[in-house]
Amino acid sequence: MVNFYDVTLRDGNHAARHTLSAKFVADYCDIADKSGLWGVEVGHGNGIGASSFLVGKASTSDQVLLETARAHLGRAKLSVHLIPGFATIKKDIIPAIDIGVDVFRVGTHVTEVDTARKHIEFISEHNKICHGVMMMSHTVDARSQAAQAIELERFGASAVIVMDSAGHFVPSDVRERIRSIKDSVDVAVGFHAHNNLEMGVANALMALEEGAQIIDGSSMGLGAGSGNASLEAIIVNYRRSFADDQELTPYLEMSQLVELECQDFLPRTTSSSIQSGNAGVFSGFAPQVRQISNEFGISQEELWQELGKRRLVAGQESMIREIAQDLMNL
C-alpha cells in the first residue's frame, strides 16, 4: 500500500514566504481530509521552531497553524517537519505532542543523521510516528545513504525518507537510491521530490515503481524554489500506471484552492531554478542569490556553482554573502 503525504502547508510555506494563514490551512484541510491522503504536513517552511530572521519570520505561529489543522483533520494524520537546531524537544516537540500531532519528521543533512537521534528517540518513546528524513540526498552515493538509513532505523524511525532537496536527481538516481535503501532496512522507504530540473513527478513515479511506500507531493507543486512534485499529477499518473482507483476529485479541488489563494506564489521553472538544480543547491536560496549577485556584480550561475561546491544546506543563508565576497577576491 502506498501512503501519499501532502507537504503543501509546510513546503508551500517557503513559496508563500511563510505567510500561509490559519483560514487557508482550515479550508485546505477540510478538503484534504476527504482525499484519502495519509498525512498532511503543516508549519513553517523550515519546520516547527524555525521562524526567525535568518530563514524567515512566519506571519502565523506554529501553534495556531497546528491547532487549526488539528481541528479540521480527522482521517488524515497531522504531521510536522522539524530540523534539530531549529526545533528543540522542550520548546517545539512537546507542545506539538500536546496539540495532537500524529507524525513527526526529523530532517537532517544526509551525512549528519546522528544529530537526529535524541529527537527520534524522544518522539518514539512518546508513541508517535517518527520518520527520519535525509535532506540533500544527492551529496552522497547510494551506498553511503543506505548506511545513514540504517542508523535512522536503529534510532527508532518507522520510515526513512529520501529528500531530493535540490531537485538534482533524474529517475535513474531515484531507482538506485530506493533499491539500495530497501535492501538495507526493514522500515518503510519514502521519497520527496523537488522540481528544479522538471523531473519531480517522473522521479516520484520511479520511486513508486521501485516500491517506495511513502510519496510526498504538494498541490500545484507549491514549494521552495521551483516547487515540489505536483500532488495531483502524481495521483493521476499513479492511477494510470498502477491501475489504482484513487479518487482524483479532492486533489483537483485542493489544487484549485491553491491556484486561487496562492496566485502570487505558484512555482515556475526559471534560469535560477535550473542553475540551482544543476549545482545541487537548495533552491530556497534563490532570493538571496539574486539579491547578493546583483549587489556584488557577479553572475548568479557563478554563485550557484560555488554554493554547490561548498555544499551549503538550508539554514546557512548567512554564508552566501561571505561566499560572494570570496568570489570577488579571487
Where are these regions (language model features)?
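Catalytic cores and adjacent flexible loops of soluble metabolic enzymes
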Residues: M1-L330
